């Protein structure tokens, strides 16, 4: 009646008659299209059958196919039942030995509890240790994925660092004028780089040095150097003068430019501000600023980019853009 309760009460267009509902109409006929595989009933051994099996087990724990066939004929059971009985009997013997030494009692109990059950009983015991090992491997793999996630975040940080880099790219300057600074990316800080002009390839330094820059200038250079606002800050500036550099300013489309490209724009940027605002009157690099018409420091505002200093007359009209 269980199969009848699981079936819908009416046949849907005659489809419900196949399967277990047919077994109700013809209970004597077995149909292979049952919805669920029926569990095989347990084989119950009589005392005489067990005596014969135990006698063979005393002789050998691993009987070959011929010995199993012979015993199966004696006890009037199929050979597969004899094979499963020997398998479970060996498992029971192992469990007794392990319980004597009190090691691995739990998985052994799973093996030994059904002495005469088929292979499902032992497979349940056999699958528990691989589950533990697979859990260990999954934890190790998760830790490895964590490591790779960390490394990927670091690499993403390094790629984000390239948002700033294409400030003094040869795209704005003529290709013949190659910059001497970005050839050797060193690990010097951005403050040192603003004086020495050496490129800095480390990502956090240009942004960690914002306080150093903000000491000299009252403008909010923290928002200027925030890692997220770099692309959105540089993009509107470059949209006025160099529309071909809009795409390098976005973080996603910047895989090709070198890393010292960012520190360059930041470093050179403030390099000139140190020269301009401190009043030292140092000459500008000819490679950085190719054709300045007005080099007075009063006309340059803080958002002055070295990419924009190629023959622009109206530096006084540029303002600092606070985002």
UniProtKB/Swiss-Prot annotation:
Residues 91-155, 168-204, 239-277 are annotated as: Disordered. It comes from the Eukaryota. It is found in: Nucleus. One of its GO terms (molecular function) is RNA polymerase II cis-regulatory region sequence-specific DNA binding. Residues 94-105, 115-127, 185-204 have a biased composition (Polar residues). GO terms for biological process: inner ear morphogenesis; lateral semicircular canal development; regulation of transcription by RNA polymerase II; retinal pigment epithelium development. Keywords: Developmental protein, DNA-binding, Homeobox, Nucleus. The keyword Nucleus applies. Residues 128-155, 168-178 have a biased composition (Low complexity). Residues 257-275 have a biased composition (Basic residues). It holds the Pfam family Homeodomain. Embryonic expression is highly dynamic. In early gastrula embryos, expressed in the involuting presumptive anterior mesoderm. Found in the head rudiment at 9 hours of development, and at 12 hours of development expression increases at the caudal side but decreases at the rostral side. With the extension of the body axis, expression extends to neuroectodermal regions fated to become fore- and mid-brain; detected in the presumptive border between the midbrain and the hindbrain at 18 hours of development, and found in the diencephalon and the midbrain at 24 hours of development. Residues 38-97 bind DNA. GO terms for cellular component: nucleus. May play a role in very early embryogenesis, gastrulation, and the development and subdivision of the diencephalon and the midbrain. Belongs to the paired homeobox family. Bicoid subfamily. PANTHER family: HOMEOBOX PROTEIN, HOMEOBOX PROTEIN OTX1. This is Homeobox protein OTX1 B. It comes from Danio rerio (Zebrafish).
């Amino acid at each position: 009646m269980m199969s009848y309760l699981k079936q819908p009460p009416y046949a849907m267009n005659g489809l419900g008659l196949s399967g277990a509902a047919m077994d109700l109409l013809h209970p004597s006929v077995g149909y292979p299209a049952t919805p669920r595989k029926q569990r095989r009933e347990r084989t119950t051994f009589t005392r005489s059958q067990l005596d014969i099996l135990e006698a063979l087990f005393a002789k050998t724990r691993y009987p070959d196919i011929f010995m199993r066939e012979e015993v199966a004929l004696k006890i009037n059971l199929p050979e597969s039942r004899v094979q499963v009985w020997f398998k479970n009997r060996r498992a029971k013997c192992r469990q007794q030995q392990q319980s004597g030494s009190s090691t691995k009692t739990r998985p052994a109990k799973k093996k030994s509890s059904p002495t005469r059950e088929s292979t499902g009983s032992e497979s349940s015991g056999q699958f528990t240790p691989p589950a533990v090992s697979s859990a260990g491997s999954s934890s190790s793999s998760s830790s490895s994925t964590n490591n790779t996630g960390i490394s990927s975040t670091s690499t993403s940080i390094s790629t984000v660092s390239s948002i700033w880099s294409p400030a003094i790219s040869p795209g704005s300057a003529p290709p013949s004028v190659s910059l001497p600074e970005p050839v050797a990316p060193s690990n010097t800080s951005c403050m040192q780089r603003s004086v020495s002009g050496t490129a800095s390839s480390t990502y956090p330094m240009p942004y960690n040095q914002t306080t150093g820059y903000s000491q000299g200038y009252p403008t909010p250079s923290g928002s200027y150097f925030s890692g997220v606002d770099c692309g959105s800050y540089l993009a509107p500036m470059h949209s006025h003068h160099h529309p071909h550099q809009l795409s390098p300013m976005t973080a996603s489309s910047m895989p090709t430019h070198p890393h010292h490209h960012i520190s360059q724009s930041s470093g050179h940027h403030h390099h000139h501000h140190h020269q301009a605002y401190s009043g030292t009157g140092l000459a500008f690099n000819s490679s950085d600023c190719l054709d300045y018409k007005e080099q007075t420091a009063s006309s340059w505002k803080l958002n002055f980019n070295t990419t924009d200093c190629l023959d622009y007359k109206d530096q006084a009209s540029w303002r600092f853009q606070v985002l």
